[in-house]
Amino acid sequence: MPVYVGSSWLILAVVVIALVGPGIAADRPDLGALAYGVGALYAVGLLVAVLVHEAAHAVVARGVGHRVHAVVADIWGGHTTYDPSRGTPGSAAAIAVVGPLSNLVLGLLAWGVHPFAPEGVPSGLLGAFAFVNVLLAAFNLLPGLPLDGGQLVEAAVWRLTGSRPRGRVVAGWCGRAVVVVVVVWAIGLPLLSGARPDLFRVVWTVLICAFLWQGATAAIAAGQSLGVLARLDPARVIRPARAVSERAVLPDVDPQAAHGVPVVVDALGRPLALLSAAAMDGVPAELRERTPVSAVMARQPSEWVVPLEGDPEEDLIALVRTFQDTRASHLAVTRGGVLAGVVSVHELGAALDEIQGRPPRP
């Protein structure tokens, strides 16, 4: 599981140092320039809190069977990328809640040790570490996407309605509502009370809320797209296929046979490639008897095989995501480990366009 600290995180570190460094220098003039080194330790503490949060997401995601791609820390904090296909409301909720819970545990541990820390820098660092972890836990539990609390809202609506797309849309709108509340609290209330919010507070509120609004909007769009997928039966776009051994020679294969698209498989029955009539027709007649299908097959990406689990919505999501990840023109689908058919990206796109009332693509 790769862990990345993006270069943009350095911007966040500089901001933290610029914020806390002057205060430390004022309280501890004896430190001199080292006060900013202590500020750097504050930034490292924040990085540790973020990485523990994201690692908790990753560990639980892997534990419930998802493939985890990476853990990333950046200027916005961090994120964990994983394939959420085949999830359930329960697994989605578990993955979401464990991040804030990990921060809460860290915060409580730091708070418990804090009274025993030496006065001065160690005590200040522990207190700050406890505070930032509790703050991260509380902020991430706000009930709207793209925050973890929004994932909990999505899981709850998904569980109640049986519709993952509806859960995503509702959680996205909740995310927009959270943005409005944060803006009112951070900027609106001070203005209404006659106070003037400082520039730093305004700038960071705007930046954070812009990020949250963008994430909420993307969630709504994704939910609507998932809703379209839910209206399509995968059987409509799956063409029958038949297995052809990679050891076969061309005379053994009729690519125009009515009983399925020829798919080359290995000795264990795993789909490897497609055969086309054009490729076979290009082989001279005098060579056909001894030309193996492996010489003319169109080998596909290793991830081109999609196992169908029997849930139409999840199967469609898996197909679309695999097309996006592999950029393949065709995917092989299996049921119970046995070749079941082939899906064309063009035919899938045409079926989705028809559902949405769009004109056929050229």
Language-model-detected regions and their locations in the chain:
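Hydrophobic transmembrane alpha-helices and their immediate loop junctions
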Residues: 1-330, 334-362
